[in-house]
Curated annotation (Swiss-Prot):
<keyword id="KW-0444">Lipid biosynthesis</keyword>
<comment type="similarity">
    <text>Belongs to the PlsX family.</text>
</comment>
<dbReference type="GO" id="GO:0008654">
    <property type="term" value="P:phospholipid biosynthetic process"/>
</dbReference>
<comment type="pathway">
    <text>Lipid metabolism; phospholipid metabolism.</text>
</comment>
<dbReference type="GO" id="GO:0043811">
    <property type="term" value="F:phosphate:acyl-[acyl carrier protein] acyltransferase activity"/>
</dbReference>
<protein>
    <recommendedName>
        <fullName>Phosphate acyltransferase</fullName>
        <ecNumber>2.3.1.274</ecNumber>
    </recommendedName>
</protein>
<dbReference type="GO" id="GO:0006633">
    <property type="term" value="P:fatty acid biosynthetic process"/>
</dbReference>
<keyword id="KW-1208">Phospholipid metabolism</keyword>
<keyword id="KW-0963">Cytoplasm</keyword>
<dbReference type="InterPro" id="IPR012281">
    <property type="entry name" value="Phospholipid_synth_PlsX-like"/>
</dbReference>
<keyword id="KW-0808">Transferase</keyword>
<comment type="function">
    <text>Catalyzes the reversible formation of acyl-phosphate (acyl-PO(4)) from acyl-[acyl-carrier-protein] (acyl-ACP). This enzyme utilizes acyl-ACP as fatty acyl donor, but not acyl-CoA.</text>
</comment>
<keyword id="KW-0594">Phospholipid biosynthesis</keyword>
<dbReference type="GO" id="GO:0005737">
    <property type="term" value="C:cytoplasm"/>
</dbReference>
<dbReference type="Pfam" id="PF02504">
    <property type="entry name" value="FA_synthesis"/>
</dbReference>
<keyword id="KW-0443">Lipid metabolism</keyword>
<comment type="subunit">
    <text>Homodimer. Probably interacts with PlsY.</text>
</comment>
């Protein structure tokens, strides 16, 4: 790939440089043309850079700041007072063109507030959305948005989310005309609140979006659609519930496989297959939520992500930057709005 620079909020998340720096080094090993700017406390960052190979260090820049957005900071407070924080400086690097994307595991509300103010939304986009991919029984990813950036949404906003989600799926998975559905309490046309009903009418009249209708909660993981759209209140609860169920299933499976000698013996025989299944159910495998609809790329990692999970978020940022996701969304939205207005 051509040279690409990412900005990492090295201090964000529960583990800070203990996770972000080793993950950055692993990303550099995987992407030979990648450069990374680590933003945070240089003294803490350097601890994890001491043993790094020189060729990797030559592709790392450290910008020092000892100010951090805490997980307890309210978004407005962080926006007004944390002007030299590692999170804000990382976003500013994207705004100023020094980085193609930024990744942070920090305070979600603060990240969204700073990103919206500093990067601005794309033309035709009222609000950015938080989107992530989920597993499915067909083993293809399913994109769900919004995941909490917007608690309530009108029909126009849901329509914009559908467009952005469709373009994201095309860009990341290179899928032609991905199937888009609205999450609803039923599949019948009469079901749903006014916002969902009106959004459905707009999408039905938009030829450039492959809208398939409503989808219920029990079909989210079926793999029958590629993009599922809802407001942030519903999306966040759906995501957190899914993660909780996944953890429960993993726990129950591990517990069941340790009860009794014969069961333990069989478990050892099929250990690789069991590990593969557990990996697919692990939420860390899908770490990285994109804040789309902005004039720059911002990827949010889980706050408690380990090194491997954080690496997933970095890889997602690389992919979106390579595909020039904001430009793709802008062009597609302009084309669709032109068709609608004509």
């Amino acid at each position: 790939m051509t040279s690409l620079t990412l900005a990492l909020d090295a201090m964000g998340g529960d583990h800070g440089p203990h996770v972000t720096v080793p993950a950055a080094l692993r990303a550099l090993k995987s992407h030979s043309s990648l450069k990374i700017i680590l933003v945070g406390d240089k003294t803490e960052i350097d601890v994890y850079l001491r043993q790094a190979e020189q060729p990797l260090l030559s592709r790392i820049e450290v910008i020092h700041t000892d100010e951090v957005v805490s997980m307890s900071d309210r978004p407005v407070h962080a926006l007004r007072t944390r002007k030299n924080s590692s999170m804000r400086l990382s976003i500013e690097l994207v705004r100023d063109g020094r980085a193609a994307a930024c990744v942070s595991a920090g305070n979600t509300g603060a990240l969204m507030a700073m990103a919206k103010v500093l990067l601005k939304t794309l033309p035709g986009v009222d609000r950015p959305a938080l989107v992530s991919c989920l597993p499915s029984v067909t083993q293809k990813p399913v994109y769900l948005l919004d995941l909490g950036a917007n608690i309530s949404c009108d029909s126009e906003t849901l329509f914009q989310f559908a467009v952005m989600g469709s373009v994201l799926c095309e860009a990341v998975d290179k899928k032609s005309r991905p199937k888009v559905a609205l999450l609803n309490v039923g599949t019948e046309e009469i079901k749903g609140n006014d916002q969902v009903q009106q959004a459905a009418q707009i999408l039905q009249n938009t030829d450039q979006i492959n809208y398939t209708g409503f989808i219920e909660g029990d079909e989210i993981y079926s793999g029958n659609v590629d993009v599922i759209v809802c407001d942030g209140f519903v999306g966040n609860i759906t995501l957190k519930t899914s993660e909780g169920i996944a953890k429960l299933l993993v726990h129950q499976l591990k517990r069941g496989l340790t009860q009794g000698f014969f069961v333990r013996f069989l478990a050892k025989l099929i250990a690789p297959r069991i590990q593969a299944v557990l990996s697919q159910m692990n939420p860390d495998h899908y770490n990285g939520a994109s804040l789309i609809g902005l004039r720059g790329i911002v990827v949010k990692s889980h706050g408690n992500a380990d090194e491997t999970a954080y690496l997933q978020a970095i890889n997602l940022a690389v992919t979106e930057a390579q595909r020039r996701l904001p430009e793709m969304i802008k062009d597609r939205l302009e084309s669709i709005l032109l068709d609608i207005n004509n």
